[in-house]
């Protein structure tokens, strides 16, 4: 599995910010700006539409040598030959996802700010652990908060890469990277921008944080 490539800016789409007609241009702007991973997250589209868009996004990601991850749907990830899937605590388990995707695909798991959940995910075979929210989140304002101290502990405790999420922007991303996060997952600070030029500029700012702060792939 290409875990050595799990490093840098992790862009996550949002149907409220990237409606269907804007999805591909917005995603490409983030990739031009240096996003190394892109997760397709849309629980409102029809299965046919999701398959169509996922296939397009996979092709686009691979043009930019980025990893393509599908949110919460191992079957769709397998269908479009995605690089992996991200599952939450309320979604199907890691074993079920692994059975569908095989051993060569990435499986990431939401662990919130809970080291016990992270330990369970690590033991079950997760390839990366998503921790957060670390800052006030536009997308999930009611998500339980997590501390930088917890992030440092998770990065030291687990051999799996830790992805930090929740209210991440160019101003606070360095704190997460310096605490050990190999990647920062971003929604609103990217796709909440006014146009594709602004999305690309925000992606460049976020990507630059990995050049000037301590983080190792």
UniProtKB/Swiss-Prot annotation:
Gene3D superfamilies linked to this entry: Aldolase class I
Per the UniProt entry, what is one GO biological process?
thiamine diphosphate biosynthetic process
Q: Pfam families under this entry?
A: TMP-TENI
Q: Does the keyword Transferase apply?
A: yes
Q: Which domain of life is it from?
A: Bacteria
Q: What are the names of the required cofactors?
A: Mg(2+)
Q: In which pathway does it act?
A: Cofactor biosynthesis; thiamine diphosphate biosynthesis; thiamine phosphate from 4-amino-2-methyl-5-diphosphomethylpyrimidine and 4-methyl-5-(2-phosphoethyl)-thiazole: step 1/1
Which positions bind Mg(2+)?
A: 72, 91
Q: How is the cofactor bound?
A: Binds 1 Mg(2+) ion per subunit.
Q: Do you know which InterPro entries this protein is assigned to? A: Aldolase_TIM, ThiamineP_synth_sf, ThiamineP_synth_TenI, TMP_synthase
Please give an example of a GO cellular component term from this record: cytoplasm
Whether Transport counts among this entry's keywords is: no
Question: One GO MF term, please?
Answer: thiamine-phosphate diphosphorylase activity
* EC number assigned by the record: 2.5.1.3
Q: Which residues bind 2-[(2R,5Z)-2-carboxy-4-methylthiazol-5(2H)-ylidene]ethyl phosphate?
A: 137-139, 167
Q: Where does 4-amino-2-methyl-5-(diphosphooxymethyl)pyrimidine bind?
A: 39-43, 71, 110, 140
Q: Which UniProt keywords apply?
A: Magnesium, Metal-binding, Thiamine biosynthesis, Transferase
Question: What function does the entry list?
Answer: Condenses 4-methyl-5-(beta-hydroxyethyl)thiazole monophosphate (THZ-P) and 2-methyl-4-amino-5-hydroxymethyl pyrimidine pyrophosphate (HMP-PP) to form thiamine monophosphate (TMP).
Q: Say which family it is in.
A: Belongs to the thiamine-phosphate synthase family.
PANTHER family hit by this protein: THIAMINE-PHOSPHATE PYROPHOSPHORYLASE, THIAMINE-PHOSPHATE SYNTHASE
Xref: NCBIfam families: thiE (TIGR00693)
Its protein name is Thiamine-phosphate synthase
Organism listed in the record: Alcanivorax borkumensis (strain ATCC 700651 / DSM 11573 / NCIMB 13689 / SK2)
